[in-house]
Amino acid sequence: MIIIMKPQATEEQIGSLCQDLRRQGMQVQRNAGVDCTVLGVLGDVAKLDPHDFLIQPGVERVMPVSEPFKKANRKFHPTDSVIDCSGVKVGGRKLALFAGPCSVENYDQITDTALKVRASGANILRGGAYKPRTSPYAFQGLKLEGLALLEQAKELTGMPICTEIMSPKLVEEFDRRVDVIQVGARNMQNFDLLTELGQTRKPILLKRGLSATINEWLMSADYIMAAGNPNVILCERGIRTFETYTRNTLDLSAVQAVKRLSHLPVIVDPSHAAGLNWMVERMSLAAIAAGADGLIIEVHNNPPKALCDGAQSLTPDQYAQLVGKISALAPIVERTL
């Protein structure tokens, strides 16, 4: 349920109403907008009579919320959220550019790539230390060694680091060492992991599951937020359809849908969606045109030699060319780099 206060509602009126709701066992999420304050009410709201609140001083109107997701709901939080990733903002007018290799392989590879993507305009370094693979025989990542290499690349470049987490057991380690914790598509509904991540305050990059609906995706965001962490960034990375030419089908309509339904920022991963590096540039530009708050793109300093996903990785030169085109497009959609 949403309670919208009048613009002239006093602090005393708002505070009294919040106390009354909490006495009735409700959780109250308070959001101060430009013109008025909005109270998001969570709990067994079926036992509440909306008319009882309409007669309270300072109340403008009461609205039920039919969507199953609450904290991620734009009705609860009408203004766009901007997530601070160790100094880099995700959301708002400025585009966030995550870039780096699919997997961290060695010191030279990660530092060379990091320096080159930073020079091109990327502001967050991505790289996999733990790799969830379809085959148990495929390269699984360097794990803790890879995490240490990412930290060295961060120290060298000053870029915040983003890497994927696989297990709730790793949350404490990642909370200490990583700037943005990525939850991959396979773990979007790993509710134990999501709840554990809710105990941190680190930004969580939540990728959409292979076959997840938009509602399911936003409910997974709610798992993190309901546990106490409001810093969630959504990532559209393609969904599984009947088409087999590309790895996945990039659902750009989801960007607009999520923007309408939720206040959370949403970025796009064209690399995993296409699975083919020659598609990445056009899909990236389309994502920005569709309203994405940023991109996460795989870049490798030698794609033919990559241990993982070389076919979808751009070279540093290709990435620099892409950023130049994004820079030209950004003002048209009222964005900046």
Question: What do these predicted regions represent?
Answer:
Residues 1-97:
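Non-catalytic terminal accessory/regulatory regions of metabolic enzymes
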Residues 95-112, 135-140, 160-164, 185, ...:
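Active-site mouth loops of central-metabolism enzymes
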Residues 95-101, 125-127, 161-163, 181-183, ...:
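Hydrophobic faces of well-ordered beta-strands that scaffold small-molecule active sites
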Residues 121, 173-182, 198-204, 225-231, ...:
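Glycine-enriched alpha-helix->loop->beta-strand junction motifs that scaffold or abut catalytic
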Residues 126-144, 301-311:
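Glycine-rich, proline-tolerant flexible connector loops at the mouths of alpha/beta enzymes
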Residues 129-133, 187-253:
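Conserved anion-binding
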Residues 132-178, 182, 190-193:
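N-terminal active-site wall of soluble small-molecule enzyme domains
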Residues 139-163, 197-203, 252-266, 312-335:
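Alpha-helix-loop-beta-strand connector modules within alpha/beta enzyme cores
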